[in-house]
Amino acid sequence: KADVFIFLDNVKVEKSSWQMRNRLKTITNKEDGEVWFRIPTKNIHSDTKINEVIIDNSVNWKHKHKTIFENNYGEKFPDIKFLNKIYDKDWNKLVDFNIEFIEKCCEFLKIKTELKKASSLNAEGKKSNLLLNLCLELSATHYLSTIGAKNYLEKDKNLFKSNDIKIIYHEYKHPIYKQKGKKFISNLSILDLLFNENMNAVNIFNSK
């Protein structure tokens, strides 16, 4: 839906956020479950920005991730070739890993949306003011927001209205796809979709 997607990489990071960890499905003889896989980071303070977070490479996190992939998705892990290439590279900053991962997922899913980093733009401010200034810098007419930001955006909606920018809240409808196990678990990492459906993931993703 969006013409441009902006990575808010120059705002404060939240500990244990989705930037650092995600979930995949596990299957045992007894039940279906979930496993967290995370990227360890060095000291994060209250004022640390997302683009300042350093990966703690003293922990062999890439090996741990690959073990999770192989144990739960078996032979399907090598099929996602871009993932192997990402994990074969050396990474220092968390933001660089995350952005390349998202870029490669977009290529795989044939998503043509232009991607930009907020830190590469001139816009300043906090919360609604920052979002508004980013929209203005890019001459946007609409701002597509997650439903989670509605509480504070609604308080400042007149800021956007006075600048002829319409706020649209994206209510995500989770697709059902082929998944191992007895029950379907939603809202996992996009890797679950890619491992289970491979190239068919393009059709599933773009049908929503």
Residue ranges, per PLM feature:
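Residues lining hydrophobic/aromatic ligand-binding pockets adjacent to catalytic sites
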Residues: 1-208
